[in-house]
Amino acid sequence: MAGVILLLLSLCVGYIAYYFFRTESMNKESVRGKRVLITGSSTGLGEQIAYEFARMGAHIMITARRLQQLQEVASQCMKLGAASAHYVASDMGNLESAQSVAQEAVVKLGGLDYLVLNHIGGSGGFGFFKGDMDPVVGSTTVNFLSYVQLTSSALSALQESQGSIVVISSMSGRIGAPFTTSYCASKFALEGFYSSLRREFALQNSKMSVTVAVLGYIDTENAVKKVGNKVSMTASSKEDCAREVVKAAVLQQPEIFYPYWGIKPFVLLRDWFPGLVAKILDKCYILENIQ
């Protein structure tokens, strides 16, 4: 037992030292002129990621379902300094639409350097699983299969540029969470697919990178509306989150945790003390507001 405690303390000290003393810095000029496709970018985190790339002078293409909001975001991207800003309305519940978006991005941008997969949907409400298969199928299609379809359709262009894939995942893709069974399943699938793909790139000596962003509760309008009265957690800033995601993408880091101290300790302790982790996380839910 003493050995286990010593090991855990050593790991904690190591991660604390890494977190506070890491010196990696992002060269913003390296992004100027790069070609970026960002999905789910009419609002929330995707919108903020688009603005971060715009500030660095990238060519940007954004996509979501709502055309008017896409137009507004594209206009703001140009004001912030984007080299160009394109948009296309699309429903990621249709895999043919996902394929078309990737192909259109490659044509309009003249290639692709960053593929940022951020959209979510189809997983139903926040509550107990009652046997309904529609949310399972919907979530699998939108939150997993469309990501793979976009990657497949953009792969040749990314190979040509030795580009980067950025996957917005969740703590729910590392630790099973109640009330979001369909969503959790899709995020676990993402983690498996893209960690495997990253290894394949490495074995081929490819310079292509895969960055998985493992996120907690972020203060996007959709997230707050869906779970704001059902959890006792404080939502983290979407602007700060976007900056960290883009930094990780530019530095080609394999993964990022945000907020770091709200997620990383639980992921580390999950296998050692699963019961304790579950009890701590379960206390975050306001059960009387969940059906």
From Swiss-Prot:
Q: Which reaction does it catalyse?
A: cortisone + NADPH + H(+) = cortisol + NADP(+)
User: Do the record's keywords include Secreted?
Assistant: yes
Q: What residue range is the signal peptide? A: 1-17
Instruction: Give the residues annotated as coiled coil.
Output: none
Where is the protein situated, by its record's location annotation?
Answer: Secreted
Keyword NADP on entry: yes
Which positions bind substrate? 170
Task: Kindly state which keywords UniProt assigns to this record, in alphabetical order.
Answer: NADP, Oxidoreductase, Secreted, Signal
Protein origin, superkingdom: Eukaryota
Question: Which catalytic residues are annotated?
Answer: 183 (proton acceptor)
What are the protein's GO molecular function terms? oxidoreductase activity
GO cellular-component term (any): intracellular membrane-bounded organelle
Q: Tell me which EC number(s) this protein carries.
A: 1.1.1.-
Q: What class of enzyme is it?
A: oxidoreductase
Q: Which residues bind NADP(+)?
A: 40-66, 91-92, 118-120, 183-187, 216-222
Query: PANTHER family, from UniProt?
Result: HYDROXYSTEROID (11-BETA) DEHYDROGENASE 1-LIKE B-RELATED, HYDROXYSTEROID 11-BETA-DEHYDROGENASE 1-LIKE PROTEIN B
* Family named by the database record: Belongs to the short-chain dehydrogenases/reductases (SDR) family.
Role, per record:
Unidirectional NADP(+)-dependent cortisol dehydrogenase (in vitro).
Name under which the protein is recorded: Hydroxysteroid 11-beta-dehydrogenase 1-like protein B
* Gene from which this protein is expressed: hsd11b1l-b
